[in-house]
From Swiss-Prot:
Cellular localisation: Cytoplasm
Sequence segments annotated as region (Disordered): 85-164
Functional description taken from the UniProt entry: E2 conjugating enzyme required for the cytoplasm to vacuole transport (Cvt) and autophagy. Required for selective autophagic degradation of the nucleus (nucleophagy) as well as for mitophagy which contributes to regulate mitochondrial quantity and quality by eliminating the mitochondria to a basal level to fulfill cellular energy requirements and preventing excess ROS production. Responsible for the E2-like covalent binding of phosphatidylethanolamine to the C-terminal Gly of atg8.
Region span, Flexible region: 84-168
Primary localization: cytoplasm
Segments for region (Handle region): 250-338
Protein species of origin: Sclerotinia sclerotiorum (strain ATCC 18683 / 1980 / Ss-1) (White mold)
Name this polypeptide is given: Autophagy-related protein 3
Lineage: Eukaryota, Fungi, Dikarya, Ascomycota, Pezizomycotina
């Protein structure tokens, strides 16, 4: 299966390039829009940078020299994912289908092969409340919370003296679970979307064997959505884990539509005076956070900061137009030059152990 994907992808690289923008209609972007989105990402998050093909004969003619792909290095990954991984703290899994509510439930990874798995469900605060079992006395007063069995010290735990245990430092280093990744973003002319490539390193800075990179991929994606591929801009045929772009455009279109709907709802509430200054919205409305910006073509200034809306648990940041940039009727939540910011948040659902937000710190 991996060989078939690789062969087809090499043939698809010869697809004629389209320069017609269809970003708002189907989530696809042109090479020019990819460069604009890359410029925004590099300006906003300096851990990212543009890079050139090596050798130059590997350059794609539809992209400028020196801006063939984007790269960030040293991204930490502290844990491995097994096949039963379902998000932190045993969170449920949901599948995001084309045009479907990102918060929808009732699916499992195998129900919809065309969907994308979103890990996580039950919030930590909800889990804590489920454990918070208390008694009520005859007068109706609530008693103190009873200790969980896991909270009661075990006498056997007190027997071992940590200072008396002789540890082998070499063994600790060899078994260290910490890895780092170099992340690449390239453009695919066939799917007209970005494509993510991952190259891993052990804690000792030694290259991570390609098959071990799959330990950091959510189980349902292994060999199906994520395959091992040669990076097209290098001549030494370095195998990398690559997230196949066949569904990127449709999922991005879903996110664009939902963000626009949330922004429209927020504007209506503002007109009716239903919003409270400083209050935090929940759900998709909480993703919309206004901020000032200029056009990406204006080289004098771009952005001072990326502000996240929502209830503190939201992963997505929805960006909007300055009033001077477009009329209210044309206002959208996510512009094309902000595409890669949302794209990386989307990609994080495939590799939740890799700290993608590390690359997006201000």
């Amino acid at each position: 299966m991996n060989f078939l994907h690789s062969t087809l992808d090499r043939l698809r690289e010869f697809t004629p390039v389209s320069n017609t923008s269809t970003f708002r209609t189907n989530g696809q972007i042109t090479p020019e829009e990819f460069v604009a989105a890359g410029d925004y990402l590099v300006f906003k998050f300096p851990t990212w940078s543009w890079a050139d093909a090596s050798p130059t004969s590997k350059r794609a003619s539809y992209l400028p020299a020196g801006k063939q792909f984007l790269v960030t290095r040293g991204v930490p990954c502290h844990r491995r994912l097994d096949d039963d991984f379902a998000g932190e703290a045993g969170h449920d899994e949901t599948v995001v289908g084309d045009g479907e509510d990102f918060r929808g439930t009732g699916h499992s990874p195998g129900d919809d092969e065309d969907g994308w798995l979103r890990t996580g469900g039950l919030a930590a605060s909800q889990e804590a409340r489920a454990r918070d079992v208390r008694t009520v006395d005859e007068s109706g007063e609530m008693g103190e919370r009873e200790d969980d069995e896991d909270d009661i010290p075990d006498m056997e735990d007190e027997d071992d003296d940590d200072e008396a245990i002789i540890r082998d430092p070499k063994a600790d280093n060899a078994n260290s679970s910490r890895r780092t990744y170099t992340i690449y973003i390239a453009y695919t002319p066939y799917y007209r979307t970005p494509r993510l490539y991952l190259s891993g390193y052990l804690s000792s800075s030694q290259p991570l064997p390609p098959h071990l990179m799959m330990e950091d991929i959510v189980g349902d994606y292994k060999d199906k959505t994520v395959t091992l591929e040669d990076f097209p801009y290098f001549s030494n045929n370095i195998k990398m884990a690559s997230i196949h772009p066949c569904k990127h455009a449709s999922v991005m279109k879903t996110l664009l539509d939902r963000a626009d709907a949330a922004l429209k709802l927020r504007r209506e509430k503002q007109k009716q005076g239903k919003t409270v200054p400083g209050a935090k919205d929940t759900g998709m409305e909480g993703l919309v956070d206004d901020f000032e910006k200029t056009k990406i073509s204006d080289k004098k200034a771009m952005l001072e900061g990326l502000k996240a809306g929502g209830n503190g648990n939201d992963e997505w940041e929805v960006l909007q137009h300055d009033q001077d940039f477009a009329s209210e009727e044309e206002e959208v939540a996510i512009r094309v030059d902000q595409y890669l910011v949302v794209f990386l948040k989307f990609m994080a659902s495939v590799t939740p152990g890799i700290e993608h937000d590390f690359t997006m710190g201000v």
